[in-house]
Every structure is written in structure tokens, then in C-alpha cells.
Amino acid sequence: MAAVRVLVSPRLASALLPLSGRHRTTSQRAAIHSSAPRPRARVALVLSGCGVYDGTEIHEASAILVHLSRGGAEVHIFAPDVPQMHVIDHTKGEPSEKESRNVLAESARIARGKITNLAQLSAANHDAAIFPGGFGAAKNLSTFAVDGKDCKVNKEVERVLKEFHGAKKPIGLCCIAPVLAAKVIKGVEVTVGHEQEEGGKWPYAGTAEAVKALGAKHCVKGVTEAHVDQKNKVVTTPAFMCETELHHIHDGIGAMVKKVLELTGK
């Protein structure tokens, strides 16, 4: 068969060459090989010890870390360098009378050692702050477990909450931790779940009345939901205030983390 010659203009021939055979401009090379990295939200996670009855609820802290990781956040973990209110033997649910522990040292267990004194946390260096629950929030970060509506909040915790709120940076809280925002941020909207026990499904339903007594607005939400106070940029979810399957709690925390990250704008 006779060969067929196809006449192609030099300009068209250049266009038909594979990319690897053509000269590229700097901007073309950049567009092909890379893209501008998306800024990562810097999130401070504030712990209150290690263990549901006298510190941080470990499952909540872990769920928060998983969802922050999935959301691409850069996480820094903090805790106050103060003694725990007391130590609970978690096999019995009773105080260990002769034992004392430090909140920062205990929180380091969850942080795998990568933790900083809360006194060094600055809102200027972070885009958001998140507080897991566990009774440590009501015993070590505040005196809510003992004093209810007349409670005091740890001075560093109060400072951090006021700094982030004043800078209009989002704050996430779950389980019992929303009482901290209720005490510090006037008129804030939070949820601790439902307001009736409903046959034991919501064993801490009475906390809703305490939230109201602190001057906050309580918003009823299910365990898989998060409430967003758009004005104050405070996001809350019930977590273990509800007796339910772990994956429901995990989903609710995911909703909270997602909203917090959205509010950072990153």
C-alpha cells in the first residue's frame, strides 16, 4: 500500500505533541504538578484528665481527634497544670481516698505525651478550641459538680473561653462541658440533649435546668445532632449525656467538629 503523507502545519503539529514533548511555562508546570495547599485550621483541644468519672471522657476525646484528623485540622492539646478534685476508682465508681493526680499529667495519657500547659494557649495562635466532656469538665475545669449554678471556672479555662469568644473564633463543647460556656459567655445557646429523662435514656436531663440557671439558653437536640449558636460561634452536642450506642455519640461529635471547622473558614 502506498504511504499516505499528511501535511500538517507546524503550529498544529506542535499542538498534537504529547505534553511531555512540549516546552511548558512555569505556570503550566505548577498547574500540572501541584496545587496551592489549603490552609489547615489550627485547633486547640482542652482536656481535663483521663477517665470519665474524674477527667476527660476518653471516647469523646478520641472521636474528636478522629474527626479533626479527617477534617484536615492541625491539633494541639492542652490541659491545666492543677490537681484533680479527686481520683475515682473506675472499677467501683468510688473515690480513692489516699490517691491524688495531676490534670496535665493524666491528660498526657490521651495526648500520647504531646501536651502543653493550658496557661500557654493563646487564641491568637489558633482558629478554634474544643472541650470534650467527662466529669473532669465539671470537677477539674470548674466546680460545677459541687456548686451547680454557683460554680467557679478555672481561671485559665475562663481566660481561654473569653479569648476565643472575643476573637470571634469558634468553640466546640460536648457532653457536660457546655456548662463552661454557659457560665462564662452571657446568654449563650447550648445543648446538653433532652430535658426529660425519658425512661433513663437521658439520665442527666436535669443539667438542662442548671444551664438555664446559669443564664444560658438550652436547646433540645438529639445525640447525633449539634447545636450552633451562630452569634457566639459556640457549637455543642450531647454525647454521653445520652445512654445510647457508641456510634451515635461518635456521629454527634462528628457533626460538632464539622460545624466548628466550617466556622473557622478554612
From Swiss-Prot:
The modification N6-succinyllysine is found at K201, K221, K231. It is found in: Mitochondrion. One of its GO terms (cellular component) is mitochondrion. It comes from the Eukaryota. Keywords: Acetylation, Mitochondrion, Transit peptide. The modification N6-acetyllysine is found at K149, K155, K162, K201, K217, K221, K231. CDD domains: GATase1_ES1 (cd03133). InterPro entries: Class_I_gatase-like (IPR029062). The keyword Hydrolase does not apply. This is ES1 protein homolog, mitochondrial. By 2D-PAGE, the determined pI of this protein (spot P2) is: 8.9, its MW is: 25 kDa. Residues 1-39 form a transit peptide. Belongs to the ES1 family. Its main location: mitochondrion.
